[in-house]
């Protein structure tokens, strides 16, 4: 399995414990075990994290060559809730690719094979080259409790600080 350079640098997916199980041009399979800190206020997996898993599988599938491909849009339909201890798997497959645009379907299933969510992703290929992989992956910070206060600052964050 060859991990694309973008995945070697993907601290967010690493922090969430995602595992790339399959990586081929136009397709991928990524899994993630749901932890307690991934649950929302109803004690079910936060929908944003289900989407993040699907988005990671989508990103791997659509980055097929030496040009950076990004999401141009995506729609998700949630079909089943899950909870801590369950393993979710996102399987992405290219449906069409024409010029710089692509269309991908991503299915998220639980460990029994039940469908949890479906995503339709639209990709746009740029002229940019992927960044060089970092020599050593950055250790992603662990989750911060929602009730922990943010660090005090005398001034608001600038846009540059937000996007660092």
Where are these regions (language model features)?
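Terminal targeting signals and extreme-terminal segments of soluble enzymes
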Residues: 1-138, 142-164
């Amino acid at each position: 399995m060859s991990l694309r350079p973008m995945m070697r640098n993907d601290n967010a997916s690493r922090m969430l414990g995602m595992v790339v199980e399959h990586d081929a041009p136009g397709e991928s399979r990524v899994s993630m075990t749901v932890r307690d800190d991934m649950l929302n206020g109803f004690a079910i997996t936060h929908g944003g994290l289900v989407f993040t898993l699907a988005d990671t599988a989508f990103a791997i599938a659509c980055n097929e060559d030496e040009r950076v491909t990004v999401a141009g849009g995506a729609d998700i339909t949630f079909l089943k809730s899950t909870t801590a201890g369950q393993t979710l798997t996102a399987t992405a497959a290219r449906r069409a690719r024409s010029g710089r645009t692509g269309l991908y379907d991503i299915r998220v299933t639980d460990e029994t094979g039940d469908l949890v969510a479906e995503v339709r992703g639209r990709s746009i290929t740029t002229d940019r080259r992927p960044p060089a992989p970092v020599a050593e992956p950055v250790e992603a910070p662990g989750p911060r409790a929602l009730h922990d206060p943010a660090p005090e600052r005398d001034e608001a964050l600038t846009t540059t600080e937000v996007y660092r």
